[in-house]
Amino acid sequence: MDAGAQLDAFIDRYSPQVASDGRRALSFLEQRLPTATRLVYDNYNALVVGFGPTDKASQAILSIALYPEYVRLFFLRGIELNDPGGTLEGKGSQVRSVKLHPISRIEGADIVALIDSAVANAYPLPRTGKGKLIIKAIAAKQRSRRPAA
């Protein structure tokens, strides 16, 4: 199974709403960052797809994480971003995020400005070509991908 088919199978384990939202968020970032390498981590708590210039996780700029009830956009160096509207959440030393509910929020001017700023301040993406999709890790043990009943 190729990486695209594997990613689709990972997403299909979520509820129809979260799967649809996750695909929409990923498609939005793929269109904005067509040369980015996408790194997939099917972790214990969530399915995470990082976007960066290379296959090194340390150079990832953004990531989309699918949780059982929602999708979240992470800015891996979010602490460095100018966020006058207070859009970003988090208190850690580096990462900031935003819950994408409704999913159309990813297309809002505030989020797009943060995405553009994160990309502008990161290690540069390739200028040409199409980014690769790489399955980096699949956790043997995982939480349910569906909300608790």
Where are these regions (language model features)?
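Charge-dense, helix-prone N-terminal extensions
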Residues: M1-A149
